[in-house]
Design a protein with these regions (language model features):
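Short glycine/threonine-rich loop-to-helix capping motif typified by GTGT followed
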Residues: 54, 180-190, 283-290, 337
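Short Asp/Glu-rich motifs
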Residues: 50-51, 180, 202, 387
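Short, structured secondary-structure boundary patches
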Residues: 51-66, 190-194, 295, 396-402
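Positively charged, Gly/Ser-enriched RNA/tRNA-binding surfaces
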Residues: 19-36, 45-46, 81-84, 92-106, ...
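Acidic, His- and aromatic-enriched active-site or binding-groove loops in soluble protein domains
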Residues: 58-74, 187-211
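Charged, compositionally biased N-terminal leader segments and the immediate start
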Residues: 1-4, 183, 188, 195
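TRNA-binding/sensing appendages of the translation machinery
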Residues: 1-91, 95, 103, 151, ...
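Glycine-rich, mobile lid/loop segments that gate access to catalytic sites or pores
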Residues: 170-181
Length: 410
């Protein structure tokens, strides 16, 4: 039998799980203090729903579940690979939320401010910062079309990061509608814009040359590709310059409002920036998009945007929706590398007792010590020195004994 976890998935030791529990607890505390409510959805979703979710390249990373019994036999006999699966593991929390809202809309407030902290799955090539099973911490607002929803999500998400000691980050903001207008003005056809945006979003992974090569492979107009390459090469581009290519000035006004308001709320604690190349890879985004980046990590540690058409796929009527997701694994990884310590955590000690000890008295003493310490009761070993060394190596701060009043701190 193999003892290692599957590639891209991890076993967590107690110390790391304790830190993760604390970080997730602080994030949830911030979300709940802002009036958001937590829900839960199944890990498995209908395969047809997943296929129609406009998830961009994530649709190629779905863990699919084979049909069972006679249905599998019939699917195999059909010769069509698409018939083999009827369900799959969720790749993010947006599609499940949209389905959940459509199913429960009559029981939910409007606007609906919701929390999801749960596991998602992608058939990634495992590497640092990219796992096949990972946790996302999402907040979403459904039923509010105003830019105040974007501002609130940015405010709450950044406060959550600040509350766990995360600093030095930048909130990057763009609007897909402005970007689409710019791309159309460069010569890309309207029906190719989603594909162009998905490629453009890979800029930080494959670079400008990679973007150009991928667009060329898609057989898009050479003149449009060169125009986009020139735009990328130009470096810093102002919002006014890009917005001039957009047909609706109100879109640019909303983006300016969000940038200005978010910057005022930041109050110098983090940066807020317009990022003309920000796209986000998921195809379901319809308006503003945002990401949080930091110097300690090459990719985004949080991201989100507006997805006004997703719920409508289930209901047949459009419901405005916008969400922001913290990349929990990446944030935890950065904090661990920085040697993060849980503020105000009680020291962990062991209460050692002899084999003839009255166990009622042992547990009573442990209860008294827990006013000051986190206490684990353990039988005392024959070689006390060796046992104390093992406890220290395991992260214990000290030990207490039944026949002594003081605590031995290592």
């Amino acid at each position: 039998m193999k003892t290692q976890a599957l590639k891209g998935m991890r076993d967590l030791l107690p110390a790391e799980q304790t830190l993760r529990d604390y970080i997730q607890g602080k994030i949830l505390e911030t979300y709940r203090a802002s009036g958001f409510e937590r829900i839960s959805t199944p890990m498995l979703e209908d395969m047809e729903n997943l296929d129609k979710s406009d998830g961009g390249d994530n649709l190629n990373l779905i863990f699919k579940v084979l049909k069972r019994g006679d249905k599998l036999t019939a699917a195999l006999n059909s010769g069509d690979p698409k018939q083999l699966s009827d369900m799959g593991l969720r790749y993010d929390l947006t599609l499940p939320l949209s389905r959940y809202y459509a199913a429960n809309r009559d029981k939910l407030p409007s606007p609906f401010k919701v929390i999801q902290t749960d596991r998602v799955f992608r058939a990634e090539r495992p590497q640092k910062g990219r796992l096949r099973e990972f946790v996302q911490c999402d907040i979403d607002i459904l039923g509010d079309s105003s830019p105040n929803a974007e501002v609130e999500l940015i405010d709450v998400t950044t406060r959550a990061l600040l509350n766990i000691g995360f600093t030095g980050f930048t909130v990057n903001i763009n609007d897909r509608r402005i970007l689409r207008g710019m791309l159309e003005s460069m010569g890309f056809a309207a029906d190719t814009l989603d594909s162009v945006c998905i490629t453009f979003d890979k800029m930080d992974k494959i670079g400008a040359d990679g973007v150009k090569a991928e667009l060329t492979e898609k057989q898009l107009p050479e003149s449009a590709i060169h125009a986009l390459a020139d735009f990328i090469a130009a470096g810093e581009v102002t919002l006014d310059a890009v917005a001039a290519r957009c047909a609706d000035p109100a879109i640019a006004d909303d983006l300016k409002y969000v940038l200005a308001t978010a910057n005022a709320l930041a109050d110098g604690r983090y940066q807020v920036a317009y990022c003309p190349s920000l796209v986000r890879g998921q195809g379901y985004y319809t308006g503003m998009v945002f990401e949080i980046t930091c110097p300690q990590f090459s990719g985004a540690v949080a991201g989100g945007g507006r997805y006004d058409n997703m719920v409508g796929k289930f209901l047949g009527t459009q419901v405005p929706a916008v969400g922001f997701s913290i990349g929990f694994e990446r944030v935890c990884g950065i904090l661990l590398e920085q040697g993060y310590q849980i503020p105000g955590a009680k020291q962990k000690i062991a209460l050692l007792y002899g084999r003839d000890a009255d166990f009622t008295a042992v547990l009573s003493k442990a209860a008294a010590l827990r006013d000051t310490y986190q206490v684990t009761v353990l039988p005392q070993g024959k070689k006390l020195g060796k046992q104390l060394g093992q406890l220290e190596a395991a992260g214990f701060a000290g030990a207490a004994f039944m026949d002594k009043d003081d605590v031995k701190i290592f």
